[in-house]
């Protein structure tokens, strides 16, 4: 569905630089604490305030950085990530960190001395691994910004390192392709214990309304795993009136406004749902919303729908399911009492490979009325 734009490429690199330093204040609600360290950091680390204080020249990019952090599952409260960002623009280092599989932050991430370097080799996951010649400019520009900022900080960092015995410094963590890691490939493999329980989530549009539900796909729109996402719409082209079509919360939880077109709601049990291609977002970060609460409209202009990059052919919402910050394969999960089967590849609408089951009856892609969570 979406490809990372050239601007997004540069901003993904800047993300690693921009989140340097800082200890996040721990003020998470009981619900968020139960959902894991990743979500605590998502709410507690204020990117906008951090950039205003520590990197004012990057402050104008705070929304894009939040978007890409939410899009890719990158933790925000990291340190020593500037070096990783510069290394990421070289082919040799990109081969080291190219793995699509990350490991979710563990409880040790709560200790600031360690949590700030956890992303040292991972802040580049949003960077495309296949680059064309035309992509060199944004990558080199981002690298230049990283190097300039590193020179500015070099003296102070060197002094700090001299005060820390070498044996106590955290090692640079490198993830080889196909091994371990912090990401989508860790979630939803056969034998997984966690499946979104029946009754937790409803369709992300108002109860009683009928929206078109398309085939399952990955968050990027290509490949077949994890197919975490569904596109839903009421129809209409660019410029159509979408003000009466409301995207609604799939379940109660804490609201995160990543950008003007992208939001996330953190639910119980480590689950969260994301909503992209939006306009008129109704809530700010930290708000508590109930299931079925209207949160936004599908964007009716391509510029707004793609406020942080990607592709879209018309007004719709791109809905995704996450578990502990990683996109989660929908096969076997429940939505409004329907059990989802998704065994093909992205956007496959063949009814033998993508269908929803309820009360013993299978239903293909098409229009669905939202009955609520069951």
UniProtKB/Swiss-Prot annotation:
Free-text cofactor note: Binds 1 zinc ion per subunit.
Keyword presence, Zinc: yes
Q: What span is annotated as the signal peptide, if there is one? A: 1-24
Q: Which GO terms describe its biological process?
A: proteolysis
What UniProt keywords are attached to this protein's entry? Disulfide bond, Hydrolase, Metal-binding, Metalloprotease, Protease, Secreted, Signal, Zinc, Zymogen
Q: List the disulfide bonds.
A: 261-307, 351-364
Organism domain of life? Bacteria
| Keyword Protease listed | yes
The cofactor named in the record is:
Zn(2+)
What EC number is given for this enzyme? 3.4.24.32
Which residues, in ranges, are excised as the propeptide? 25-195
- What segment(s) does the record annotate as region Disordered? 128-187
Q: In which broad location class does this protein mainly occur, judging by the first location in its UniProt entry?
A: secreted
Location within or outside the cell: Secreted
Provide the Gene Ontology terms for cellular component: extracellular region
Assigned protein family: Belongs to the peptidase M23A family.
Name of the protein this chain belongs to: Beta-lytic metalloendopeptidase
